Amino acid sequence: MDIISQLQEQVNTIAAITFNAFGTLQRDAPPVQLSPNYPEPPATTTVTDDATPFPEQPKQLSAGLVKAAKQFDALVAALPLSEGGEGAQLKRIAELQVENDLVGQELQKQLEAAEKELKQVQELFGQAADNCLNMKKPE
């Protein structure tokens, strides 16, 4: 897997961790009194699958997020540096475009030859089918 694909996968991982962290915190956070004028909210007991106490959950979730972010940073650091600056990059892009045009022209020639051959095969097939139908005895 190339570095760009790994970076995309890591971004998806960070997004999933963040999404799950917000969801878990919303689900398991204890109720908070909004104003002294309102009565104290009732305590809720939520059973979680991993049975981690709520005060520990934010620490675990943030540790996972930091770990994923560090992996992302390591992947970014592994990206090759461009040599020669912007001018060299533009020159390389121009070279690649010329090469792409040449390959495109060659592919176009091959496509035209293949279409010509397909027409010939279709004509021969039609002739063969007509010959077979003409040889068939009437009933």
Swiss-Prot record:
- Bias regions of kind Low complexity — which residues? 43-54
The knockout outcome noted for this protein's gene is: Embryonic lethal.
* Gene Ontology biological-process entries: defense response to fungus; regulation of DNA-templated transcription
Region Disordered, as annotated, extends over 28-58
The record's InterPro entries line, in alphabetical order, gives: Med7/Med21-like, Mediator_Med21
Pfam families, per the entry: Med21
Q: Which residues form a coiled coil?
A: 92-132
Give yes or no: UniProt keyword Electron transport. no
Gene Ontology cellular-component terms for this entry are: mediator complex; polar nucleus
Read off the Gene3D superfamilies from this record.
Mediator complex, subunit Med21
What is the annotated role of this protein in its UniProt record?
A: Component of the Mediator complex, a coactivator involved in the regulated transcription of nearly all RNA polymerase II-dependent genes. Mediator functions as a bridge to convey information from gene-specific regulatory proteins to the basal RNA polymerase II transcription machinery. Mediator is recruited to promoters by direct interactions with regulatory proteins and serves as a scaffold for the assembly of a functional preinitiation complex with RNA polymerase II and the general transcription factors. Required for embryo development and defense against necrotrophic fungal pathogens.
**Family from the record:** Belongs to the Mediator complex subunit 21 family.
Q: What is the annotated quaternary arrangement, including any partners?
A: Component of the Mediator complex. Interacts with HUB1.
State the protein's name: Mediator of RNA polymerase II transcription subunit 21
In its UniProt entry, the species of origin is given as Arabidopsis thaliana
